[in-house]
């Protein structure tokens, strides 16, 4: 299957990510792909994401050519190209959400002290600013409350694909990194970071409601600056929404 995605020159997909430096969020790239896939594939039917690698920034007015290969019950493999340049590739499986495995949710339990306002910690702005507050910190991670705003372009009909909660996890990781920098610099500093990879993401529901609290927890699994890998999970309405691993790149 071949799919052409015309990235708009501006508009809701770029609002808040990042002001003055518009970049299509990696998760938005997956939402656009999911919306373009034929049935029975589709963003709300994703049950797992074995891997995704975001290899290049997607900018306003980009023209993306997507090649999709069916793997039967194993879902799809896909490549996203801008001309000859590979900008993303990955795999998705589809079907009923996976049954929760019963693993404990990794919540950072130490109460944070003197946390600056979230907009001082990360460069995101509404409607792409999901994290609302920090509820716990640890030496290797953090737990934040987040919400997907109803006016976010990733929302349709009051809900978003469940994997959009990975953006809340990525922002939680960015908040923790900013807090970790503050003891050495004297103040927290908002720096642009990028979501560069997903691995072994298992989804326990098809969608998440907008304007509803999410609890996103991240724990550092590996670090080789400027790259970092985090084990993440997100719960909503008292139930696990997803669990997996993300990779981030901190610029500057």
Show the residue positions of the predicted features.
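HotDog/MaoC-like acyl-thioester-processing domains
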Residues: 1, 56-116, 123, 143, ...
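Catalytic strand-loop segment that frames the active site of acyl-thioester-processing enzymes
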Residues: 1-24, 125-161
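Hydrophobic residues in beta-strands and at strand termini
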Residues: 5-7, 54, 94, 148, ...
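Compact, glycine-rich, soluble single-domain proteins
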Residues: 21-25, 29-30, 156-176
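Hydrophobic beta-strand-centered segment that forms part of the acyl-chain substrate-binding groove
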Residues: 33-67, 175-215
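Short aromatic-glycine motifs in intrinsically disordered, low-complexity regions
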Residues: 40, 115-125, 187-190
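Extracellular/lumenal ectodomain signal focusing on beta-strand-rich modules
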Residues: 48-51, 89, 132-136, 200
């Amino acid at each position: 299957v071949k799919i052409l995605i015309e990235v708009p020159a501006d508009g809701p997909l770029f609002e808040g990510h990042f002001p003055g430096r518009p970049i299509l969020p990696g998760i938005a790239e997956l939402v656009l792909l999911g919306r373009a896939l034929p049935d029975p594939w589709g963003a709300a039917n994703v049950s797992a994401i074995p891997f995704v690698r975001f290899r290049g920034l997607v900018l306003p007015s980009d023209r993306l050519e997507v090649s999709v290969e069916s793997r039967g019950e194993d879902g799809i493999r896909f490549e996203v190209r801008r001309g000859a340049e590979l900008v993303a590739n990955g795999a998705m499986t589809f079907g009923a959400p996976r049954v929760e495995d019963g693993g404990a949710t990794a919540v950072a339990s130490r109460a944070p002290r003197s946390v600056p306002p979230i907009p001082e910690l990360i460069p995101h702005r509404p409607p792409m600013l999901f994290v609302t507050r920090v509820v716990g910190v640890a030496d290797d991670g953090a737990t934040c409350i987040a919400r997907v705003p109803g006016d976010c372009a990733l929302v349709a009909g009051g809900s978003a694909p469940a994997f959009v909660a990975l953006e809340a996890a990525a922002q939680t990781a960015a908040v923790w990194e900013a807090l970790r920098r503050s003891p050495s610099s004297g103040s927290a500093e908002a720096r642009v970071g990028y979501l560069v990879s997903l691995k072994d993401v298992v989804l326990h529901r098809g969608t998440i409601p907008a304007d509803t609290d999410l609890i996103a927890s991240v724990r550092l699994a590996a670090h080789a600056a400027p790259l970092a890998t985090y084990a993440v999970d997100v719960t909503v309405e008292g139930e696990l929404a997803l669990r997996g691993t993300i990779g981030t790149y901190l610029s500057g």
